[in-house]
């Protein structure tokens, strides 16, 4: 609700009576609504009245619960809430209706004053109406908080299921490798058995590293959500977001004569994330790909519905690639590679990207072969 106007009296003169006409004007964003506000305020300022008129402007987009409370079916609408009884005006000729009814309302106040009942009755009516509005505001706020908390609980349950699924695969693979390794130790020490043992050792170590990374991501996500980011998560579609972002890069692709390919299915499920933060991640990864891809190279953006629980976004380029031993470290701050000489390095950008994705309980990683380009991937939870 917009701050209420000061009680409007005739030509600004003060009145000694506490009686007043309490009005609520409900408007939307249309220019015609602004014109009605102007006309009514102008009329009130020029009015000669024995009683102050308190006009409050209500924007229905910001206070939909008040529209429901007063049972309005059209806007703009004017509601007299005091003195009682309540009266609602609406329609294309709202200003003319108001002028006509205002005369009647003022006469009614005079009659009430003569009967010596008006003052107490109106004070009670004003207090009652004000309390109703305050209660309606509080109920609306509590409903919003409840909906947000329910969404968060639903999201947490989904994340737990997703993490359990992600941990099960490497845990099963590691268990099989260890059990097979135990059997291998009972075999004669031939060259083949020694090679098998080494392969099993490597397989087990690899799976344990995957589990360690997943657990680290979970812990970092908790820290990120608590200390580094204020997430405003909601349901949205990556198709629309990606198309918006790509439209911003059309000129850049042409200027650098880059070939751009996209693979974004239209039947992707919605995701549950902070849309603006995910926008930053995609833009950062695209800018990096453009920066390191030579003229005539190729940039690809693809989105894949990997499982029922997550969606994967991939951005690939045909740049110089990243050495295998550096691929994990590039997500740390201030890391520079040989190819960064003369350029602004990945460093801070990728570090922030990882923090954002971890805050959503997603994963981000890179696949790259030197001299054959890089593919950056990240996952987001599906909205269910």
Swiss-Prot record:
It catalyses: ATP + protein L-histidine = ADP + protein N-phospho-L-histidine. One of its GO terms (molecular function) is ATP binding. Its EC number is 2.7.13.3. The keyword Acetylation does not apply. Pfam families: HATPase_c (PF02518), HisKA (PF00512), KaiB (PF07689). GO terms for biological process: circadian rhythm. The modification Phosphohistidine is found at residue 165. InterPro entries: HATPase_C_sf (IPR036890), His_kinase_dom (IPR005467), HisK_dim/P_dom (IPR003661), HisK_dim/P_sf (IPR036097), KaiB_domain (IPR011649), Kinase_SasA (IPR023527), Sensor_HK_Regulatory (IPR050736), Sig_transdc_His_kin-like_C (IPR004358). Keywords: ATP-binding, Biological rhythms, Kinase, Nucleotide-binding, Phosphoprotein, Transferase, Two-component regulatory system. Residues 162-384 form the Histidine kinase domain. Homooligomerizes. Interacts with KaiC. Participates in the KaiABC clock complex, whose core is composed of a KaiC homohexamer, 6 KaiB and up to 6 KaiA dimers. SasA and KaiB(fs) compete to bind to KaiC. HAMAP family: Kinase_SasA. Member of the two-component regulatory system SasA/RpaA involved in genome-wide circadian gene expression. One of several clock output pathways. Participates in the Kai clock protein complex, the main circadian regulator in cyanobacteria, via its interaction with KaiC. KaiC enhances the autophosphorylation activity of SasA, which then transfers its phosphate group to RpaA to activate it. In addition to its output function, recruits fold-shifted KaiB (KaiB(fs)) to KaiC to cooperatively form the KaiB(6):KaiC(6) complex (independent of SasA kinase activity). The N-terminus interacts with KaiC, while the C-terminal histidine kinase domain autophosphorylates and is probably responsible for self-oligomerization. The N-terminal domain stimulates the C-terminus to autophosphorylate. This is Adaptive-response sensory kinase SasA. The gene is sasA.
């Amino acid at each position: 609700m917009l701050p209420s106007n000061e009680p409007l009296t005739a030509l600004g003169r003060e009145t000694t009576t506490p009686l007043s006409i309490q009005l609520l004007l409900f408007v939307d964003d249309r220019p015609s609504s602004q014109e009605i506000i102007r006309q009514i305020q102008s009329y009130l300022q020029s009015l000669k009245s024995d009683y102050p008129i308190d006009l409050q402007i209500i924007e229905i987009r910001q206070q939909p619960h008040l529209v429901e409370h007063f049972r309005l079916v059209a806007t703009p609408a004017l509601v007299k809430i005091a003195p009682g009884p309540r009266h609602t005006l609406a329609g294309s000729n709202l200003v003319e209706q108001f002028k006509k009814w205002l005369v009647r309302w003022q006469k009614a106040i005079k009659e009430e004053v003569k009967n010596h009942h008006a003052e107490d009755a109106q004070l009670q009516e004003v207090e009652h109406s004000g309390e109703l509005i305050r209660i309606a505001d509080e109920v609306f706020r509590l409903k919003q908080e409840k909906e947000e908390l329910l969404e968060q609980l639903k999201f947490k349950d989904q994340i737990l299921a997703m993490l359990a699924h992600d941990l099960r695969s490497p845990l099963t693979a590691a268990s099989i490798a260890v059990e097979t390794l135990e059997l291998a130790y009972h075999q004669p020490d031939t060259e083949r058995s020694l090679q098998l043992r080494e392969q099993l050792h490597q397989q087990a170590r690899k799976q344990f590293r995957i589990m360690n990374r997943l657990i680290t991501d979970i812990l970092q996500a908790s820290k990120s959500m608590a200390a580094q980011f204020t997430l405003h998560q909601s349901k949205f579609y990556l198709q629309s977001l990606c198309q918006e972002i790509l439209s911003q890069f059309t000129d850049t692709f042409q200027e650098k004569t880059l070939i751009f390919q996209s693979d974004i299915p239209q039947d992707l499920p919605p995701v549950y994330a902070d849309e603006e933060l995910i926008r930053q991640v995609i833009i950062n990864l695209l800018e990096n790909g453009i920066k390191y891809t030579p003229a005539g190279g190729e940039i690809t953006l693809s989105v894949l519905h990997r499982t029922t629980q997550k969606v994967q976004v991939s951005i690939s380029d045909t740049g110089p690639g990243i050495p295998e031993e550096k691929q994990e470290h590039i997500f740390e701050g201030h890391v520079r590679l040989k190819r960064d000489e003369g350029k602004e390095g990945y460093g801070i950008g990728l570090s922030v990207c990882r923090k954002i994705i971890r805050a959503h309980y997603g994963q981000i990683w890179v696949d790259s072969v030197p001299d054959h380009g890089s593919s950056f991937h990240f996952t987001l939870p599906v909205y269910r």
